[in-house]
Amino acid sequence: MRHIKTIDDITKDGKVEFGDGYDFVENTEEADAILMRSTDLHGYELPTSIRAIARCGAGVNNIPTDEYAKRGVVVFNSPGANSNAVKELVIAMLILSSRGVVQSMKWVRAHADDPNILVDAEKAKKAFVGRELKGKRIGVVGLGNVGSKVANACVDLGM
């Protein structure tokens, strides 16, 4: 049985992936490994029992990798794990900005108490039509985990 100490908030779904043979402990002294996200481990008192550190994220700038390597502690990260989420946010921003969604929401809030909102909305709606993304060109700088997903999603949108 391997014992894992989680330092940051790790979802239950993430912990379930470990399956049998692993349990999660509260005390770092009992742990064989640490599962973490963003806590800065520079200056962290790492028990000698720790053999591995897994970071749920792309970078390892919050982990003193050179120091831990000298101690034989293996450091893992998960580059690209959030790439789909980032791609979705990029596409959302493209749609929001091309269609004036934020501006139209502000207009609705500003006119929410207006008894003539339907008439006024009919007059104002042309300002919020925006442009379709289909047929537009986009430049994607870098085709790594995120960039390639963004580029493919844009192709799927007809860009």
What are the roles of these predicted feature ranges?
Residues 79-137:
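Phosphate-binding beta-alpha-beta segment of Rossmann-like dinucleotide-binding domains, i.e.
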Residues 17, 89, 93, 149, ...:
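Rossmann-fold NAD(P)-dependent oxidoreductase module
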Residues 1-4, 38-55, 111, 116, ...:
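Long, low-complexity, intrinsically disordered polar/charged segments
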Residues 1-78:
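An N-terminal-biased, well-structured beta-alpha scaffold segment characteristic
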Residues 123-159:
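Rossmann-like dinucleotide/phosphate-binding beta-alpha-beta segment
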Residues 7-11, 87, 147:
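A structural signal for well-ordered alpha-helical scaffolds and beta->alpha junctions
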Residues 59, 81, 143-144:
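Short donor-sugar binding/catalytic loops of nucleotide-sugar-dependent glycosyltransferases
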